[in-house]
Amino acid sequence: MATEGLHENETLASLKSEAESLKGKLEEERAKLRDVELHQVAERVEALGQFVMKTRRTLKGHGNKVLCMDWCKDKRRIVSSSQDGKVIVWDSFTTNKEHAVTMPCTWVMACAYAPSGCAIACGGLDNKCSVYPLTFDKNENMAAKKKSVAMHTNYLSACSFTNSDMQILTASGDGTCALWDVESGQLLQSFHGHGADVLCLDLAPSETGNTFVSGGCDKKAMVWDMRSGQCVQAFETHESDINSVRYYPSGDAFASGSDDATCRLYDLRADREVAIYSKESIIFGASSVDFSLSGRLLFAGYNDYTINVWDVLKGSRVSILFGHENRVSTLRVSPDGTAFCSGSWDHTLRVWA
């Protein structure tokens, strides 16, 4: 028995070293293709002009830290979730609250709007993803119509509907992502590969979007094929947890924001990191990132209460937006690109334009 154990250990060690040497060879091959940096290519591109954006609306109503938010496809409504256990649907034009749900747990870390605008999904420390249909009958009890869709073995960190109301993608502290059928609550596909908590995910922007990207506490960003459940690309250049990932509008690249105080851009076709957005003066982590509709700007919320706006091509900072009185936890550009909304630990959401 002892010799068997020894053989197993030797085999494992040799497999590990083989994997490491293959990794090294892959890195060498990747390095050969690195002929030019993005900012060098962008030198001939005209610089951006004067950039002015300010808070147009402040949404107040949460009794604790705002943890997540999402826009409705109608470009007007916003859903937000908070540490107070409440999920609120807002009209961003009038700042009125249209719906409010009290969850059975605090720390509602994830919320999402269904593509049809007729339902919302949310979850957090209850390890579940719950879907609530939205109706405008004021007497109807939303909680009674709740559907428990996803069950993880640890907290729910992110959720997103696919291109229909019928399927939902979740990320969890149990180190997995999963695809669920909303109607039956059945698990359709699970995605294993992260070595620690998965903190964020984003769906590829195409209509046939069969891939998504996830990031987590193992400092890895992974691109997944939803049909096979396999990881098709992985990027490991961050030095700390990845808090946010977001696809470039074309779907050919994605950005990430991390506790290492940098945001990074990864090109999927070049299979490598092509830009780092950082400054020596930025020492706090980036909690949330999103692109402008054109893809030229990257908005990033930080733990030092600011929002930095980066020129994606040139890698330079175009603007800093002040207003929040605590760390910015979530940030999303509206579907028509005319505004973006940020949520913060100061209990408020702000709409900027």
Curated annotation (Swiss-Prot):
Keywords: Membrane, Repeat, Transducer, WD repeat. Disulfide bonds: none annotated. GO terms for biological process: G protein-coupled dopamine receptor signaling pathway; negative regulation of voltage-gated calcium channel activity. GO terms for cellular component: membrane. It comes from the Eukaryota. One of its GO terms (molecular function) is protein-folding chaperone binding. It is found in: Membrane. Pfam families: WD40_Gbeta. WD repeats lie at residues 61-100, 103-142, 151-192, 194-236, 237-276, 278-320, 323-352. Belongs to the WD repeat G protein beta family. Enhances GTPase-activating protein (GAP) activity of regulator of G protein signaling (RGS) proteins, such as RGS7 and RGS9, hence involved in the termination of the signaling initiated by the G protein coupled receptors (GPCRs) by accelerating the GTP hydrolysis on the G-alpha subunits, thereby promoting their inactivation. Increases RGS7 GTPase-activating protein (GAP) activity, thereby regulating mood and cognition. Increases RGS9 GTPase-activating protein (GAP) activity, hence contributes to the deactivation of G protein signaling initiated by D(2) dopamine receptors. Component of a complex composed of RGS9 (isoform RGS9-1), GNB5 and RGS9BP; within this complex, the presence of GNB5 stabilizes both itself and RGS9 and increases RGS9 GTPase-activating protein (GAP) activity. Interacts with RGS7, forming the RGS7-GNB5 complex; within this complex, the presence of GNB5 increases RGS7 GTPase-activating protein (GAP) activity. Interacts with GPR158; promotes the GTPase activator activity of the RGS7-GNB5 complex in absence of glycine, in contrast GTPase activator activity of the RGS7-GNB5 complex is inhibited in presence of glycine. Interacts with RGS6. PANTHER family: GUANINE NUCLEOTIDE-BINDING PROTEIN BETA G PROTEIN BETA. This is Guanine nucleotide-binding protein subunit beta-5. It comes from Pongo abelii. The gene is GNB5.
